[in-house]
């Protein structure tokens, strides 16, 4: 089985996050995206410290689909430099991990 990844990204607001999530799931780039509003981010950008409300997206995908997910997310994201970070899932419920892999197949298998 392909390596499963958990991809972390922030968006400026819940509506933008939901739009990104829906597109990525509809295009089979992510099997599932959790949208978690209410995040506060503090970061340094262009020489200043900023504090902003953001919404977190937690995406589940495969290593094989990650390059396409990253490219699509980068194209759709409103930030100049979006936070897109992926970590490998070292363990999980095998049936769930299989489901993630099946939902992100470029060409879905026939349910024959």
Question: Which stretches of residues belong to each language-model region?
Answer:
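Positively charged, small/polar-rich N-terminal and surface patches that mediate targeting and assembly
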Residues: 1-112
């Amino acid at each position: 089985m392909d390596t499963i990844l958990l991809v972390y990204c922030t968006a400026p607001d819940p509506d933008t996050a939901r739009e990104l999530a829906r597109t990525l799931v509809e295009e089979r780039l992510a099997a599932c995206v959790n949208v978690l509003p209410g995040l506060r981010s503090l970061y340094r950008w262009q020489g200043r410290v900023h504090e902003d409300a953001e919404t977190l997206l937690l995406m589940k995908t495969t290593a094989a689909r990650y390059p396409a997910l990253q490219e699509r997310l980068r194209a759709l994201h409103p930030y100049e430099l979006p936070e897109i970070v992926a970590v490998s899932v070292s363990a999980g419920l095998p049936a769930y991990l299989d489901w993630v892999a099946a939902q992100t197949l470029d060409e879905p298998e026939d349910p024959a």
